[in-house]
């Protein structure tokens, strides 16, 4: 059973002008398939990315899919500000990355850039969307 936790950040995600939401997401190609299969590496990657971006980690969950030596991994970090997610397809050297935060104190683009640097893809996309209520 999940227990509700009080946020250490007053009015998380709500600024003077309304809700502040920032969404950074994209895709990576040409990543080493061994990295994309390494669930422990990916788990630690999102934990460090949350720290780099000034997010407050609540929990991290990891799932393996597809079996065999080319099965994918999904890692989702729940942070007080929202989430970080990585979904991998090692057989295609491909992954998707999603970082969403609420509030003005966190820097989702820093988390995204950190993940990109560590995965070292041959190519990637990066989309930044303002999801604020302003």
Swiss-Prot record:
Assembly and binders: Heterooctamer of four alpha and four beta chains arranged as a tetramer of alpha/beta heterodimers.
Required cofactor(s): pyruvate
Coiled-coil portions: none
A Gene Ontology molecular function term of the record: adenosylmethionine decarboxylase activity
Protein's name in the database: Arginine decarboxylase proenzyme
Cofactor note: Binds 1 pyruvoyl group covalently per subunit.
GO cellular component, one term: cytosol
UniProt source species: Caldivirga maquilingensis (strain ATCC 700844 / DSM 13496 / JCM 10307 / IC-167)
């Amino acid at each position: 059973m999940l227990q509700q936790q009080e946020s250490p950040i007053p009015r998380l995600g709500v600024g003077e002008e309304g809700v502040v939401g920032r969404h950074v997401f994209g895709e990576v190609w040409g990543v080493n398939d061994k990295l994309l299969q390494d669930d422990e590496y990916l788990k630690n990657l999102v934990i460090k990315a949350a720290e780099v971006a000034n997010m407050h980690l609540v929990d991290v969950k990891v799932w393996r899919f597809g079996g065999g030596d080319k099965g994918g991994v999904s890692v989702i970090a729940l942070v007080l500000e929202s989430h970080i997610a990585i979904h991998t397809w090692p057989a295609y050297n491909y992954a998707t990355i999603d970082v969403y935060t609420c509030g003005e104190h966190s820097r989702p683009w820093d988390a995204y850039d950190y993940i990109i640097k560590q995965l070292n893809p041959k190519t990637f996309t990066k989309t930044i969307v303002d999801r604020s209520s302003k």
